[in-house]
Curated annotation (Swiss-Prot):
Partially overlaps HEF3. The keyword Transmembrane helix applies. It comes from Saccharomyces cerevisiae (strain ATCC 204508 / S288c). It comes from the Eukaryota. The lineage of its organism: Eukaryota, Fungi, Dikarya, Ascomycota, Saccharomycotina. This is Putative uncharacterized protein YNL013C. Keywords: Membrane, Transmembrane, Transmembrane helix. Its main location: membrane. GO terms for cellular component: membrane. It is found in: Membrane. It is a multi-pass membrane protein.
Amino acid sequence: MLTSKIYKLLTERDVLDFKLKIFIRRNVFITHLFFLLHSLLLFLSQFCRREFAFFLPTINLVTHSIKFITLFFFFLNSWASTLSCNPIMARGCHFPILNRPNFVSQILSKFCRMRNNNDTTFKSF
């Protein structure tokens, strides 16, 4: 009964002001998060790959999955062909012809995996 009296005391304008304050506060939190992530990326961009490789094991990360994901993307961005199980052709422009979606051919289009299965490739001249 007390809540109904309080609700009746609130006007429509008060309710809209309250919703607007919640909306603004939520957007402020999101912008703070973006600023934090942006500053973290700027901090990590100061390191070259060799320095980052030595810097990463010394960090005491909260979970092991964060370290695994970071190392996974670090290996994907490196140019060494010995990091993958399949050999990578770095010369020329190859387009794989696939019957199914493939993460490497769609997202990482710089590389073409060469293997012995039903996938075929052709070279564009």
